Amino acid sequence: MPRLVMKFGGTSVADLDRIKNAAKQVQREIDNGYDVIVIVSAMSGKTNELVGWVNQTSALYDAREYDAVVSSGENVTAGLLALTLQESGTPARSWQGWQVPINTTSAHSSARIMDIPEANIAEKFATGMKVAVIAGFQGVSAEGRITTLGRGGSDTTAVAFAAAFKAERCDIYTDVDGVYTTDPRIEDKARKLDRISYEEMLELASLGAKVLQTRSVELAMRYKVRLRVLSSFEDVTENSGTLVCDEED
């Protein structure tokens, strides 16, 4: 069965109602015939709150404990989305980075993904699971410690899973309905692009566009992962959003 990766950012899972909406988006793709891997961010504002707690707790900076704390927001979101899907009758299971495992370097707070073995999740798909909900932004080092990938790391997680599982596409759900020539929230004349090349997307990112994290676009370009940027808050059709792909695709 074909696989699809869907990534939901913090605003898309900001509260329980939005998590329910994300579950509906996932169910639509199951109905379209996909096994779905969902990557989730922490609920909007939660990571900043966790960072604040760390800073209030100790003036000492321990990178390993910092990552252990700030990665927990994604774990909460993953569990809540899996429960929401189960409640509607969809076989779903949440996975934290160490459970997959998402193997990374030991550079805490800026780790790089080295490897994502397919076996554990593929086995669950083979036995009836329809949705794997993955906590983004995190992994595990060779020393067995939780690591984080840096701000925007959930985008990188999503692309890495799409490459590892040979997904048909990686859909990035956010609070805008695609990639624009400039920020539509501050510029009325901003124009939405139906498709854009990896190189053009990297150029926009270098100029400050925050729709996709730069590292995730570089990874998508390397492994030829087709990306689609969509709004969580609009009905999705075949022509929705912006497709980010190879110029010749």
Where are the model-predicted features located?
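Nucleotide/pyrophosphate-binding catalytic subdomain
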Residues: 1-218
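Structural preference for solvent-exposed beta-strand-turn elements
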Residues: 222-229, 235-239
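Short, solvent-exposed amphipathic alpha-helical segments in soluble enzyme
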Residues: 54-56, 222, 246-247
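Long, charged amphipathic helices and adjacent flexible linkers at domain junctions
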Residues: 233-249
